[in-house]
From Swiss-Prot:
Residues 420-452 form a propeptide. Glycans are attached at residues 249, 337. The GPI-like anchor contains a phosphoceramide lipid group. It comes from the Eukaryota. The keyword Lipoprotein applies. Disulfide bonds join 71-100, 215-345, 233-264. Keywords: Cell membrane, Disulfide bond, Glycoprotein, GPI-anchor, Lipoprotein, Membrane, Signal, Transferase. Residues 1-19 form the signal peptide. This is 1,3-beta-glucanosyltransferase gel1. GO terms for molecular function: 1,3-beta-glucanosyltransferase activity; glucanosyltransferase activity. Residues 325-419 are annotated as: Disordered. Splits internally a 1,3-beta-glucan molecule and transfers the newly generated reducing end (the donor) to the non-reducing end of another 1,3-beta-glucan molecule (the acceptor) forming a 1,3-beta linkage, resulting in the elongation of 1,3-beta-glucan chains in the cell wall. Involved in cell wall morphogenesis.
Length: 452
């Protein structure tokens, strides 16, 4: 979604610090945790079976979790599909979300949430300017709004900010945002909610970005990594699609890995990839994925068509339902990597990977108070934005500076001698990737909402 330049300043009252909202959340929900390179629900391996959910897309931005009636309408379809997770790209952090989140919890459905909006996000063309205290106040307020729900599975710190070689120079700012979110969650004494990044469907630097998000000190590392993948276009297979090579490339990776978008629509969608994604061919490395997308929008990826209170199932709905019904999760733990662990940071390889060193920008000075005082009230969709406002970072962070009281939510070792240490960047010999329209037309803004 193309965000317009923001010219009005967002006034954040430094003297008025509001407590996190009082949330009446379900107590009988089992939170999802991280062990090694996998997600767990209690003692049981958890595989994401979900869809991307943003009715209206970028042309009619709305918060689906604040729309209780629409949420309950769609939960009936989620249950019919057998989903356990939805991803939402943008929410209004000034609104109440209790009714929908509790209804999702009652249905056994978890939320993976992008903290950004088109107006509050890292601009890949101006990452230094857009990484500022006004931006951090917004995303921290979003954490406040959702941390109390036990079915909040994870937060995305960014979506497709890096979409080619040159834009990889923004990677330190994406990683800094991830660090800041993790520190905020711990400093505010919330439960350990995983934070990670959703990468674009590009071969250029996908693996380097994954390595980068899992290198350095524990406070600098992500809790998981996800990427969008439209390379399996039916009719295809595990090998023809190149997915076998991706499994090979990511074998030994120390963080949970899943597909944040999948479902090529070049041909008729049969979702043949589902049988591979939840088989032992992949479950040692992958933890499932999210199908793009629930509602029919301009890019024609929809499973259903929504008109007011009416929901019409499209052919892809039945195809996905059938694919899920035919595919069970593997028994046991799916051969996950129990050790986990950090890997070395990738070396600069311009123009594909244009990151000079491992240093990250320090959190902007005015944003430090949020760690102890809280972020205060979120401005919501009506806020003026943060792209060109606020105080920027003026220093380089010391490793460990983003630490806070509490253990790592990744539950993995910070040593580069762990199982992930052998992860190396292969030559780009994968099968040709058919990139979805979402990636091809993504804008210069690394907004949390990139829908077409």
């Amino acid at each position: 979604m193309k965000a317009s330049a923001v010219t009005a300043a967002l006034a954040v009252g430094a003297s008025t610090v509001l407590a996190a909202p009082s949330i009446k959340a379900r107590d009988d929900v089992t939170p999802i945790t991280v062990k090694g390179n996998a997600f767990f629900k209690g003692a049981e391996r958890f595989y994401i079976r979900g869809v991307d959910y943003q009715p209206g897309g970028s042309s009619d931005l709305a918060d689906p979790i604040a729309d209780a009636d629409g949420c309950k309408r769609d939960i009936a379809k989620f249950k019919e599909l057998g989903l356990n997770t939805i991803r939402v790209y943008s929410v209004d952090n000034s609104k109440n979300h209790d009714e929908c989140m509790n209804a999702l919890a009652d249905a056994g459905i978890y939320l993976v949430l992008d903290v950004n909006t088109p107006k509050y996000s890292i601009n890949r063309a101006k990452p230094k300017e857009s990484y500022n205290d006004v931006y951090l106040q917004y995303i921290f307020a979003t954490v406040d709004a959702f941390a109390g729900y036990k079915n909040t599975l994870a937060f995305f710190s960014g979506n497709e900010v890096i979409n080619d070689g040159p834009s990889s120079s923004a990677a330190p700012y994406v990683k800094a945002v991830t660090r800041d979110l993790r520190q905020y969650i711990r400093s505010r004494k919330y439960r350990e909610i995983p934070v990670g990044y959703s990468a674009a469907d590009i071969d250029t630097n996908r693996l380097q970005m994954a390595q980068y998000m899992n290198c350095g000190s524990d406070d600098e590392r992500s809790d998981f990594f996800a990427f969008n993948d439209y390379s399996w276009c039916d009719p295809s297979s595990f090998k023809t699609s190149g997915w076998d090579q991706k499994v090979k490339n990511f074998t030994g990776y120390g963080l949970p890995l899943f597909l944040s978008e999948y479902g090529c629509n070049t041909n008729k969608r049969q979702f043949q990839e589902v049988s591979s994604l939840y088989s032992t061919d992949m479950t040692g490395v992958y933890s499932g994925g999210l199908v793009y997308e629930y509602s029919q929008e301009a890019s024609n990826y929809g499973l259903v068509e929504i008109s007011g209170n009416n929901v019409k199932e499209l052919p892809d709905f039945d195809a996905l339902k059938t694919a899920f019904e035919k595919t069970s999760n593997p028994s046991g733990d799916g051969n996950y990597n129990k050790t986990g662990g950090a890997n070395p940071c990738p070396a600069k390889d311009a123009p594909n990977w244009d990151v000079d060193n491992d240093a990250l920008p320090a959190i902007p000075e005015p944003a430090k108070k949020y760690m102890t005082e809280g972020a205060g009230k979120g401005p919501g969709f009506a806020g003026p934005g943060s792209q060109d406002r606020g105080t920027q970072s003026t220093a380089t962070a010391e490793p460990g500076s983003g630490s806070a009281t509490g253990s790592s939510s990744s539950g993995t070792s910070t040593s580069s001698k762990g199982a992930a240490a052998g992860l190396t960047v292969p030559s780009l010999t994968m099968a040709p990737v058919v990139v979805g329209a979402v990636t091809l037309l993504s804008t210069v803004f690394g907004a949390g909402l990139v829908l077409l």
